[in-house]
Every structure is written in structure tokens, then in C-alpha cells.
Amino acid sequence: KTAPEVVEAMLPYFTEYYGNPSSVYSFAAQNKEVITQQREIIANALGAKTEEIYFTAGGSESDNWALKATAEAYGNKGKHIITTKIEHHAILHSAEYLEKRGYEVTYLDVDEYGVVKLDDLKAAIRPDTILISVMFANNEIGTIQPIKEIGEIAHEHGILFHTDAVQAFGQVPINVDECHIDMLSASGHKLNGPKGIGFLYIRKGVKIRSFVHGGAQERKRRAGTENVPGIVGIGTATERAIRTMQERTKKETEVRDYLIKRVLYEIPYTRLNGQDRKSVV
């Protein structure tokens, strides 16, 4: 659920501070500054630049934007995309959408632990591959993918790399430079923030096009009046998640390991679906 301190931070922006951040009057300028502050919090959490964070309505929009707009922008270079069979439907359905429009998509299998096989990834790369999209951590079994290695492979071949980090952001440390990530999707409600708010990290220099057209918000890349309460919510939730990450991880890992051990020991014919170590709790 939404953490009490997140709700408390959001409340004034429903009533007291209700100015439109895109307007020119002083009442609006205050909210514009608040949005910049939240953008900085998220950027710092990822080791990114402030101007590389774009607010959206959630993880699904971010995933759709990353795949569809990248395909459109780089379609003259190639029409081949690589992803996996265990992605969130926001990725899988976006991939299907692109297939119907002339793009080819390779769906990689995973091993018994839910991990992408790097040799399979390398074998799937073609001269016309423009994008690799692999989720950071699986939303069903929690398996964390070898993101850094995948990013290295992508960049060695001049391919853009996107990761759906909805299940991982705020749960495990992420540095976009160290992991060679070009685009990253995240959502507020997965880190005790509000629903209906997320963001897409887009590395500077990636020629991704606008997905929602209209106004000039989000540096002309995502139109629509900014959801100020939601943005304050995801910023506060991010700050809280980073601050408490070490303590939460220790406690939750102990509970997880205890549960797995008891179930495997006491219930016949059970097996663990996923990994017991490299996974989000």
C-alpha cells in the first residue's frame, strides 16, 4: 500500500498547491520546481542525469513508449527486436503490435531458474537488430537477470538496451551507466508509492520519439498536464525506498529464506520455481 509519509507528502498538492506547472504565473512556478526536485531524486537513485527522467502514467506506458517509439525512430536502421518469453504483457503485447506492422521479434527462452541464456542472446543478434528489451526482475518468480552482461552485449553490437525495472527499482541498487542501460521503466506503486505514476529513463542521445502528443510537457516528449501529486508521491517513495533498502532487504531475505526452507523440508514433492539468491524479495 502507499506509505503514510508518501500520502502526507502528496496531500497538499491536491488542494493547497494546485497550480498548473506548465503555466507562467508564480503559483505554477512553485509546482514546476517541485517536479524538478522529484526528478533529481529519481535520477540520483539511478546514477542518471535529471533531464533523462520522463514522468509517465505508469510502467505499462513506459514500456509501450520504449518499444514502439524506439522502433519507429530506428526503423530505418533495422526492424528486428529481441526480448524474452517471460516479459510483462506491456512488453509482449507491444512486441506483438510491432510484429503486425512489419517488425520481427525474437522471444528468448530462459533456463530452469528463469534466467536468460547469454549465448542464446548473442546468437539471436542480427545486423538489423535495433533493440533488446529484458526485464530486470521477473514479476512472478523474482529472478534477477544478468542485466550488466546483457547491456554489455547490446552495446558491443551497437544495439539499444531497455529494461523493465518495475519490480526492481527501489528494491535493489541500479546504476544505469554500470549496467549499460539506455532506457528503463519503473512504476510508483511497486515501491509503496501511488498508482498511476511512473517514469521512463531515456539516456541522453537516444533518438526516441514522442508517444503522447499535444503540449510541450516533459521536454516536448510526453504531452499532458503533469500529475503533480503523483510525481511528488513517486519521488517521496523513491527517497524512502533508497533510505530503507538495506534494512528491508535484510529482514525480507531472512523471512523468504525461512519460508522456502520450511516448505521444501516439510511438504513432499515441492520445488522452488526460480532462484533462491539472485531474486528480488
What are these regions (language model features)?
Residues K1-V281:
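Pyridoxal 5′-phosphate
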